[in-house]
């Protein structure tokens, strides 16, 4: 999960130490974030995109973050100095996040080292393309690979007993 992983990256601590073991929990915001250490070392710091950490992005000179999980189309963002005050922006979330990251790079202090974290929504379900790509492959027939319906019966024990099946855990029916 991205939120517990992000909490581990930000704090340098395992989930059981930083408090963010699953989505419903919140990171222990009394823990030091690496962005705070970078600021103390003279870095300019920024985060753009998905945050979803149940606390303000501390240790960042600039942030432009999605509300909660974020929406693919016309998402709402909160920005530096206005944490929790979300404003809707028109467009596709990947384009908007990328544009905000580039804008930060263009206006940052060029005399200081910097750290920019860009967290895209795109890796998170439900996967929605930009409207400009929705029908790009509408007339293309993609054949399923021969192993698509493989039941793993003839595979080794590790593959045979694996828990993550496409049908049960990756919601194949919905995604197809």
Question: What do these predicted regions represent?
Answer:
Residues 1-176:
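Formylglycine-dependent sulfatase
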């Amino acid at each position: 999960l991205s939120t517990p992983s992000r909490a581990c990256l930000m704090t340098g601590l395992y989930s059981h130490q930083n408090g963010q073991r699953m989505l419903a929990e919140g990171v222990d915001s009394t823990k030091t974030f690496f962005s705070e250490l970078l600021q103390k070392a003279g870095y300019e710091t920024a985060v753009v995109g998905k945050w979803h950490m149940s606390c303000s992005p501390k240790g960042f000179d600039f942030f432009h973050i999605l509300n909660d999980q974020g929406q693919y189309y016309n998402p709402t963002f909160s920005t530096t100095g206005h944490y929790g005050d979300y404003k809707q922006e028109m467009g596709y979330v990947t384009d908007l996040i990328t544009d905000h990251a580039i804008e930060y790079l263009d206006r940052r202090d060029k005399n200081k080292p910097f750290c920019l974290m860009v967290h895209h929504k795109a890796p998170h379900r439900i996967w929605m393309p930009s409207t400009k790509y929705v029908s790009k492959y509408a007339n293309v027939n993609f054949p399923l690979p021969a192993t698509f319906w493989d039941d793993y019966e003839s595979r080794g024990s590790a593959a045979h007993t694996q828990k993550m099946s496409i049908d049960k855990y990756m919601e194949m029916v919905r995604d197809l």
